[in-house]
């Protein structure tokens, strides 16, 4: 099961990189980042709605009113955070290139993730940042420096 989860995460990473290029091209083609972001947001909403309705219809899964009421306030901010990322792909990626853009976003994500794991914030279990994890984060930063320089 763990292998399938890791494979799915790898596919998500691949698609995330491709999405950066498609978003930047959509923005360039339309010449209006807010409209391009709205198009991406609409597609995201419709895809998610279709998936949710399919799961509800075939698996009978839906949250209870109590579950919805007990969600921490910050857990609802994912859509806003995603919108900021989409805008960044449209405004920055084609100007700095795919490798720099993805390198920065992935490296920052790794460093922040190490911190979040270490302290167990936002619902993550605690995974202490030992020496090997810290060195791994530093190597990510060094790798980004090499990509940016060459």
State where each predicted segment sits.
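Hydrophobic/aromatic residues within transmembrane alpha-helices
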Residues: 36, 92, 119-121
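Structural motif at transmembrane-helix junctions in multi-pass transporters
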Residues: 29-33, 88-104
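Alpha-helical transmembrane segments of compact multi-pass small-molecule transporters, enriched
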Residues: 43-47, 104-119
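Residue positions within transmembrane alpha-helices of multi-pass solute transporters
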Residues: 18, 84, 111-115
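Hydrophobic core positions of alpha-helical segments in small-molecule transporters
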Residues: 39, 104-105, 135
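Hydrophobic/aromatic residues within the transmembrane alpha-helices of Major Facilitator Superfamily
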Residues: 14, 46, 80, 96, ...
């Amino acid at each position: 099961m763990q292998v399938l989860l890791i494979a799915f995460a790898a596919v998500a990473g691949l698609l995330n990189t491709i999405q950066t290029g498609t978003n930047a091209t959509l923005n360039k083609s339309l010449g209006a980042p807010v409209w391009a972001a709205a198009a991406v947001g609409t597609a995201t909403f419709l895809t998610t709605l279709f998936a949710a309705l399919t799961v509800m219809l075939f698996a009978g899964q839906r949250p209870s009113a109590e579950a919805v009421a007990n969600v921490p306030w910050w857990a609802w901010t994912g859509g806003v955070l995603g919108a900021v990322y989409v805008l960044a792909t449209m405004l920055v990626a084609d100007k700095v290139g795919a490798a720099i853009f993805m390198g920065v976003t992935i490296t920052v994500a790794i460093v922040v993730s190490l911190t979040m794991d270490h302290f167990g914030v936002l619902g993550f279990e605690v995974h202490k940042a030992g020496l090997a994890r810290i060195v791994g984060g530093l190597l990510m930063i060094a790798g980004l420096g090499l990509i940016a320089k060459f």
